[in-house]
Amino acid sequence: MKLLILFLAALGAASARIRGHTIKG
């Protein structure tokens, strides 16, 4: 279960980064 939470957290961070990059660019 911990691994799943960690994976979701990493995915959310990557998504936020991509979203911010898209808005900036």
From Swiss-Prot:
It comes from the Eukaryota. This is Accessory gland protein 98AB. The gene is Acp98AB. One of its GO terms (biological process) is negative regulation of female receptivity, post-mating. It is found in: Secreted. Responsible for physiological and behavioral changes in mated female flies. Residues 1-16 form the signal peptide. One of its GO terms (molecular function) is hormone activity. The keyword Secreted applies. GO terms for cellular component: extracellular region; extracellular space. Keywords: Behavior, Secreted, Signal. Disulfide bonds: none annotated.
